[in-house]
Swiss-Prot record:
Annotated InterPro entries: A-D-PHexomutase_a/b/a-I (IPR005844), A-D-PHexomutase_a/b/a-I/II/III (IPR016055), A-D-PHexomutase_a/b/a-II (IPR005845), A-D-PHexomutase_a/b/a-III (IPR005846), A-D-PHexomutase_C (IPR005843), A-D-PHexomutase_C_sf (IPR036900), A-D-PHexomutase_CS (IPR016066), Alpha-D-phosphohexomutase_SF (IPR005841)
Entry comment on modification after translation: Activated by phosphorylation.
Positions carrying Phosphoserine: S107
Essential cofactor(s): Mg(2+)
Keywords associated with the record: Isomerase, Magnesium, Metal-binding, Phosphoprotein
Family: Belongs to the phosphohexose mutase family.
Organism: Burkholderia vietnamiensis (strain G4 / LMG 22486) (Burkholderia cepacia (strain R1808))
GO cellular component: cytosol
Pfam families: PGM_PMM_I, PGM_PMM_II, PGM_PMM_III, PGM_PMM_IV
Reaction equations catalysed: alpha-D-glucosamine 1-phosphate = D-glucosamine 6-phosphate
Name recorded for this polypeptide: Phosphoglucosamine mutase
Lineage: Bacteria, Pseudomonadati, Pseudomonadota, Betaproteobacteria, Burkholderiales
Record bears the keyword Ribosomal protein: no
UniProt-listed Enzyme Commission number(s): 5.4.2.10
Length: 451
């Protein structure tokens, strides 16, 4: 059964346009509630309860109310966590033995966008089959439960404290962060009240930025997708490290004291090296089609098998589970460590990196000695929705020309975004000028063919 609304990371779009409208989201809550209620009736018969968390977008209030109404109409109880990182909702759903978790967020997108994503009772993203079942319920009449069966709602007042303690529990008890000055950039997003406390309570001198959300400034010039603000703050405050989260805190970027930026590919290598040092062996790690070729070569040199998944943390997770491995990442900063959490968690990932540095007594640059990333040029080309870029002879010719020129010492990757009408053009080469030239040629061909 196909899916009309769910993409690679839930349902996402511009607020006010279908499907991110209050009436659709109310029906979505009802549909999800009916699926959950059906599962509960078939198991224990107990009334299901869901947790709803959100980031700091002004539209979150409206969508939260709509979801709550939909779940209530389906006879499902609701717990409201307020602003809460996506991985925090996943953790709390599992820890509180709830039926599901729901996050209202568009992650790294601007405030005009929003989205809805679901977690199952075990803190994992819903399988495709369940998402398709929810979509099927969207076409059915909304039949409100009787008054004695309506769902009830309440606030989870200690949600932030519970999640803070969980994050701290993933850091080795033998270490602390005393003596470290850290800049923590929360992107004016969901972690603004949580992340600074985690690092402070572990002993760090914390300089928080991006912690003044107003409903409209999430990801605006701050956070993991705009790391220049972090670089400036690290240098200005003579900090040891900087950590930037995105709007829902499921990804991160790290900056060292010199202002050097480390992406998810590099951090994956650091974590694998640390795991080898502590466990003796790592069978394999998972990246994506976008992972830098230099990291793949470096991991193989360490005797670690490397597998590329499709782009999207859910696909990295699928490959890890299939193989029974622990570590995976995307260059964008989604890092998975399945012995710590069921999903990508920017705060927990930062703590894993800090623990690796503590154990080794080395800097990030030193741990990456000998690993020089191939230059990559990524261009996001906005297209008309539904544009047939795959059938364009001119685009195919530009791709073929680049692949022929880079044969043996570079890569070309073209993929459509799963969350917006954008074609991502990535070219990797040994020389930055070659990567840029070929990427721009392909991007120009895409613009001409799809405009």
């Amino acid at each position: 059964m196909g899916r009309r609304y769910f993409g690679t990371d839930g349902i996402r779009g511009t607020v006010g346009d279908t499907p991110i409208t209050p009436d659709f989201v109310l029906r979505l809550g009802y549909a999800a509630g009916k699926v959950l209620a059906g599962a509960a009736d078939g198991a224990t018969g107990a009334r299901p309860t869901v947790l709803i968390g959100k980031d700091t977008r002004v539209s979150g209030y409206m969508l939260e109310a709509a979801l709550e109404a939909g779940f209530s109409a389906a006879g499902v109880d609701v717990m409201l966590a307020g602003p809460m990182p996506t991985p925090g909702v996943a953790y709390l759903t599992r820890a509180l033995r709830l039926s599901a978790g729901v996050v209202i967020s568009a992650s790294h997108n601007p405030y005009q966008d929003n989205g809805i994503k679901f977690f199952s009772a075990d803190g994992n993203k819903l399988p495709d089959e369940t998402e398709a079942e929810i979509e099927a319920w969207l076409d059915k009449p909304l039949e409100c439960a009787s008054s004695d069966r309506l769902g009830k709602a309440r606030r989870l007042d200690d949600a932030a404290g519970r999640y803070i303690e969980f994050c701290k529990s993933t850091f080795p008890a033998a270490y602390d962060l005393r003596g470290l000055k850290l800049v923590i950039d929360c992107a004016h997003g969901a972690a603004y009240q949580i992340a600074p406390h985690v690092f402070h309570e572990l002993g760090a001198d914390v300089i928080p930025i991006g912690v003044a959300p107003n409903g409209f400034n999430i990801n605006d010039g701050v956070g993991a997708t705009a790391p220049d603000a972090l670089v400036r703050a690290v240098r200005a405050n003579h900090a040891d490290l900087g950590i930037a989260l995105d709007g829902d805190a499921d990804r991160l970027q790290v900056v060292d004291s010199s202002g050097r930026l480390f992406n998810g590919d590099e951090l994956l290598y650091v974590l694998v090296k640390d795991r080898i040092a502590t466990a003796g062996k790592v069978e394999g790690a998972v990246g994506t089609l976008m992972t830098n070729l230099a990291v793949e070569v470096a991991l193989q040199r360490e005797g670690v098998e490397f597998v590329r998944a499709a782009v999207g943390d859910r696909y990295v997770l699928e490959q890890l589970r299939e193989r029974g491995w622990q570590l995976g990442a995307e260059g964008s900063g989604h890092i998975l460590s399945l012995d710590r959490h069921s999903t990508g968690d920017g705060i927990v990932s930062a703590l894993l990196v800090l623990a690796a540095l503590k154990r080794s007594g080395r800097t990030l640059a030193q741990m990456l000695d000998g690993v020089t990333l191939f230059p990559q040029k990524l261009i996001n080309v906005r297209m008309k929705p539904g544009a047939d870029w795959k059938g364009s002879a001119s685009i195919r010719a530009a791709i073929d020309a680049a692949e022929s020129a880079l044969a043996g010492h570079g890569r070309v990757l073209i993929r459509a975004s799963g969350t917006e009408p954008v074609l991502r053009v990535m070219v990797e080469a040994q020389q930055a000028a070659d990567a840029t030239r070929h990427a721009e040629a392909i991007a120009d061909a895409v613009r001409e063919a799809t405009s």
